[in-house]
Structure formats: structure tokens, C-alpha cells
Curated annotation (Swiss-Prot):
Sequence motif Cx2C motif 1, location on chain: 276-279
Biological function: Component of the cytosolic iron-sulfur (Fe-S) protein assembly (CIA) machinery required for the maturation of extramitochondrial Fe-S proteins. Part of an electron transfer chain functioning in an early step of cytosolic Fe-S biogenesis, facilitating the de novo assembly of a [4Fe-4S] cluster on the scaffold complex cfd1-nbp35. Electrons are transferred to dre2 from NADPH via the FAD- and FMN-containing protein tah18.
Protein name: Fe-S cluster assembly protein dre2
Positions annotated to bind [4Fe-4S] cluster: C276, C279, C287, C290
Complex and partners: Monomer. Interacts with tah18. Interacts with mia40.
Region (Linker): 146-203
Annotated [2Fe-2S] cluster binding sites: C213, C225, C228, C230
Length: 313
């Protein structure tokens, strides 16, 4: 009786396509004023390939609703319009904190129109970027090379093939004597005491101090008597009132009542928010983290239901 073993694969699963690591990926950051206009987004995607370009909103990135993959993007382009100061104003420290780790080494951050000013570019520099050609680049971290610190080996000067140095054989045991004196072993160098060079007058002389380092004499505030009649008590009270008024003016905070708060926000769907107002136009105008990815276009405000895996508009 012969036994045959079937070694063929029963289920042949298709191999998933591998992404090309050399393909450059782009990230577009859109403020609400740009994302709300369909024609502006259409012009942008006519320049960049949609398959290698991601679109994100400033407010979602700053609020932490979106997490960017690390070391992914080669170019980060900030979309601008006539109100370019809006995009610059939205480049806060929270945005740089989420954006810089997602940039590859050598990746570039730039505006679609114009460039960042000195004050706005300071946040980019503090985040680890380097200014270059009107934009900012993420520097390439060079690998540290360890240095070998060690003394150089002494070379024996021999004048023969048998290891004879200056007429003395070095192959055998060393001989103690005047001829074998090693100057390198003499570490008893004569040191000079620096304090012995100073005279008594030099030690009594005060140390010179720079003008800005001279300590000020402590001044105690005079306290008025319990039954003060000279006017010192009223003078100190005036100074205290002026100091409190100035502190209250510096800490002037705008306070809102409950009626002043905007109650038009709808929090019925937890985690599903939209800031670009272009979700109804289709996937071409939706950001990468849009909850409506894959759904057909619909009218703004129209209720969308999914019943039995079918979209009901």
C-alpha cells in the first residue's frame, strides 16, 4: 500500500501589494477658510497625486483628533488664500508637536504662498526644524562615531635582527641599572604654589566685580506707628491701592456668563466632527480621518443611515 502526501496549498491567498518605500508622500494642512471652498481643493489636487497625498485640518490636528504616522511625509504644505494670516496663526506649538515626528529626516515645511515671519518661525525652530530657502527642513541626524582614545605604542629602535637596542639585548629579562633609566616614569614634576606668589597686600585687596553684579543694599520698608499722624500710614495705603489696581488691570480676564456660550454645537454623535464643511462633496474633498470615507456624495444637512450594509440617504 502506497501513501501519497498532498503538499499543495488548499487556500491560495493573494499577496498584498507592497508599497514603494521610495515614493514620496505629501501632507496638506488646510485651514477652515480654504477647506470650505471646493474650487480651491480641486486646484490643489490637480497638482498633487491623491494616492500619495494626505489632507488634514488644522483644528483637528491641534485638538488631537488625528494621529499622524511617524517618519512618513517628505513635504508638508500649508494651504493659504487671501487670508494667509489665518494659516500662520494656526501653526501653534501643539501643531508642531504632532507634525514634526511625522516628517522624515530632510522633509520640508513651507507655505503655499509667502513665508513665515520671524516670530512665527521661532516656534518651528523650537520644534527642531531648520530655516532654509524660505521654508523649514527637518535636519538629518548624523550617526555618532566613537573615538578610540589610547596612547601610542612605543616603537623600539633596534639595530639588529635579534632585538638588540643600542647594543643591549632586549629579548631577555630587563636589567636594572643606570643605562635602563626611563624618563617617562619620572612623574615628580616641581609644582609652583600660586598662593605663594601673592603678597599680603594682594590678599587684602577686594575682588573686582562687574558693574551689574554689585549687590544692592537691602532696604527695609518703614512701618508707621499705630497712631500715625505724620502721613506715612496714608502714603503706604495709597501705594498698596495703586499696586493692587495695577495687578488687577494686568490680570483682566474676559468672563462669559452661561447665556453667552454658544449652544448650537451638536454632540449627539461622539467623536464624529467635521470642520471643513466639504464632507458631502465626496472622497476627493474629504480629509484622511473623515468618518464619511467611502460614502457617496450627499446634500449638506441630509441624514445618512446605514441599514443592512446599504447606504440610505
Amino acid at each position: 500500500m502506497s501513501i501519497t502526501i498532498d503538499t499543495s496549498v488548499d487556500i491560495d491567498l493573494p499577496t498584498p501589494p507592497q508599497s514603494n518605500g521610495s515614493q514620496k508622500r505629501n501632507l496638506l494642512l488646510a485651514p477652515p477658510s480654504v477647506a470650505a471652498h471646493e474650487e480651491k481643493l480641486r486646484d490643489v489636487f490637480s497638482t498633487f497625486d491623491r494616492s500619495s497625498t494626505d489632507l488634514q485640518m488644522f483644528d483637528r490636528l491641534s485638538a488631537g483628533f488625528v494621529s499622524l504616522p511617524p517618519n512618513t511625509y517628505d513635504l508638508v504644505l500649508v494651504l493659504t488664500d487671501a487670508q494667509s494670516d489665518e494659516a500662520v496663526r494656526l501653526l501653534t506649538r501643539d501643531v508642531y508637536t504632532a507634525l514634526v515626528p511625522a516628517m522624515k529626516a530632510g522633509a520640508r515645511l513651507q507655505l503655499q504662498q509667502g513665508s513665515l515671519g520671524a516670530s512665527e518661525g521661532l516656534e518651528a525652530i523650537l520644534a527642531g526644524l531648520v530655516e532654509k530657502d524660505g521654508g523649514f527642513e527637518k535636519p538629518v541626524q548624523e550617526a555618532a562615531v566613537p573615538l578610540k582614545l589610547g596612547g601610542r605604542k612605543k616603537k623600539d629602535k633596534t639595530n639588529g635582527v635579534n632585538g638588540v637596542q643600542n647594543g643591549v639585548a632586549t629579548n631577555g629579562a630587563s636589567t636594572n641599572g643606570v643605562g635602563m633609566f626611563d624618563p617617562a616614569q619620572n612623574n615628580d614634576d616641581e609644582l609652583i604654589d600660586e598662593d605663594a606668589l601673592l603678597s599680603d597686600d594682594d590678599l587684602k585687596r577686594p575682588l573686582p566685580r562687574p558693574q551689574n553684579c554689585v549687590p544692592e543694599t537691602a532696604k527695609k520698608r518703614r512701618r508707621p506707628c499705630k497712631d500715625c499722624t505724620c502721613g506715612l500710614a496714608s502714603q503706604l495705603e495709597e501705594e498698596d491701592r495703586a499696586r493692587e489696581a495695577k495687578a488687577a488691570q494686568d490680570l483682566n480676564i474676559l468672563k462669559l456668563n452661561t447665556d453667552d456660550l454658544n449652544d448650537e454645537l451638536d454632540f449627539t454623535v461622539q467623536g464624529k466632527t467635521s470642520s471643513c464643511n466639504s464632507c458631502s462633496l465626496g472622497d476627493a474633498f474629504r480629509c484622511s480621518s473623515c468618518p464619511y470615507i467611502g460614502l457617496p456624495p450627499f446634500k449638506p444637512g441630509e441624514e445618512v443611515k446605514i441599514m443592512n450594509d446599504m447606504v440610505q440617504l
